[in-house]
Amino acid sequence: FDQDSDGNMNPVLDAFLEERENGRVKHIGFTGHCSHKAHLHMLAQLKSRGLELETCQMPMNLVDPHYDSFITNVLPELMERKYGILAMKTLVFGRLLGAGPENLRKSHGPTGNLLEEGFKLSDLLGYVLSLPISSLVSGCNTAAIVRENTTIVRDFKPMTAEQRDALLARTESHAGGKMEYYKKKV
């Protein structure tokens, strides 16, 4: 993030706030991919202006807590401020499965495959579903993936903290952000 961008963000935010006041916009949220620090900066800016938005969309997945974490650093603040939380990048565009678009594999290199390490798709999605989220955004590009995700959600049972911690312990070797190509140092 760039603090100089505040000058660009404030007029845009003000325009949306005005439209919300006029009834043309119902809810306003924010999102970002690169750094939890940008989210915390946005929340601080809003607080300094005495404002709150309704939602925040951010990357949340089973490797996130090991590196520059949105879950560890931003989620508690969002919960305290009663935001609707939208989890994205739950499978890191397929990279947790050793897949993803060819151009991404070329530009960011290969990654591990958590399925080959004994994880199930229900572990990966279930971990995020067990966090205090309002919605899980899953990129589905085939009907088969929609059906598979639907089955996982239908059969979902929330994980205990111990179950989540056990899964996290198994992904510790993926710390450092290699799988999470979108994270940038700021």
Identify the residue ranges that each predicted region occupies.
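Beta/alpha (TIM)-barrel catalytic core signal, keyed to glycine-rich beta->alpha loops juxtaposed to Asp/Glu
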Residues: 1-186
